[in-house]
Amino acid sequence: MARGRKLTMSQSERYLGSSYSYGDSNGNSATDESELTEEDIWSHAVDHSPEMLESHGAWNTRDAVVRNGRVGGGLSLAFEDASSSPRIVHQIRGGGEGGGGGGGGGRVERQLASSAPVNVPDWSKIYRVNSVESIHESDEEEEEDSGMMMPPHEYLAKSQQRRSRKSGGGGSVFEGVGRTLKGRELRRVRDAIWSQTGFYG
């Protein structure tokens, strides 16, 4: 700070506005009308019933407002739709304060998270493909050394060899390539190798 200057506004006034001060409830009426208070925002959503207050008399922020059998609070009250279907509300037995079962205050309504039933299609029947279990069984039958790990390019090469043995094809990398491996022919061989090993350039 510069030596010759006085700080004319406190930090709270600088950040929160000039009409704000701690503990000053007798502020200027013109500025008080333009300022929002907590009651302006939360008065319609707050239900000051005795059930909503804790035993200490303080507001319990975890409890929500119960309206029309639904539990909600905050923005959910602003977007409340009367035409929406009712939700399942589970009743939970709470440990009553003061011991005995008198007064009927042991039941507390709270809405638990639940999802709507979802129809999950069976894609194996739709696309008529083998199930995952049958694919794994066929892999186990064909693979001689099931305990060893192998790199992906070797795995693909072995699976290609198995396919070519079953189909009766030759062991050549690319069928029909001429003698010379110059220029275009070399590119075709390279692309064929990449397509069969799974590494595309």
From Swiss-Prot:
Subcellular location field: Cytoplasm
GO annotation, biological process: leaf senescence; response to abscisic acid; response to absence of light; response to salicylic acid
UniProt keyword Ribonucleoprotein present: no
One GO CC term, this protein: cytoplasm
Domain of life: Eukaryota
Family annotation (Pfam families): Senescence_reg
Keywords: Cytoplasm
Comp. bias (Low complexity): 17-29
Induction: Slightly induced by dark, abscisic acid (ABA) and salicylic acid (SA).
Stretches the record annotates as Disordered: 1-39, 134-178
Family designation: Belongs to the senescence regulator S40 family.
UniProt-recorded name of the protein: Protein S40-5
Record organism: Arabidopsis thaliana (Mouse-ear cress)
Gene expressing this chain: S40-5
